[in-house]
Regions:
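N-terminal secretory signal peptides
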Residues: 39-65
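Aromatic-capped interface at the extracytoplasmic side
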Residues: 19-40
Length: 136
């Protein structure tokens, strides 16, 4: 019994290490491709921080998902929802709004589900969606 507990503890520790490594590498390298966008958030004092995020286009709206543990950018945009969005040839100011309507959330999740292995690698974080509404 003691040996089993020890093995389970080691396995859990290794798993936590893999999650931390995976999340750290994604945050450090910020991989870009045709399905990503650059989201610039502004801290108080107007310090810009650029994050590369997966772009979700759903029912004529643009979204990003908050589905990793490192999410300082998300806390920043909750304080200041004015952001800059760039992808492809597009570059525009927007207002970031947390999606709270359960039907809208369900619709996006149905359209863009996460695979089990991605959720495993990221440590099963909660998933939120942010709608990016172009500023006029």
């Amino acid at each position: 019994m003691k040996r089993t507990s020890k093995y389970l503890g080691v396995a859990f520790g290794v798993y936590i290490g893999v999650v931390v490594l995976f999340e750290s590498l994604i945050g450090y390298f910020q991989p870009q491709n045709a399905a990503t966008l650059a989201l610039t958030v502004y801290e108080s004092g107007e310090q810009p921080h650029v994050r590369i995020l997966s772009r979700i286009e759903h029912r004529d709206n643009l979204y990003v998902a908050v589905n990793h543990w490192p999410r300082a950018w998300f806390r920043t945009l909750q304080d200041n929802p004015s952001v800059r969005v760039a992808y492809g040839e597009r570059d525009f100011g927007a207002t970031a709004r947390l999606v709270e309507d359960p039907r809208e959330i369900s619709s996006i999740e149905t359209d863009r589900p996460l695979t089990w292995w991605f959720r495993l690698l990221t440590g099963y974080p909660p998933r939120y969606f942010v709608r990016l509404e172009p500023s006029n």
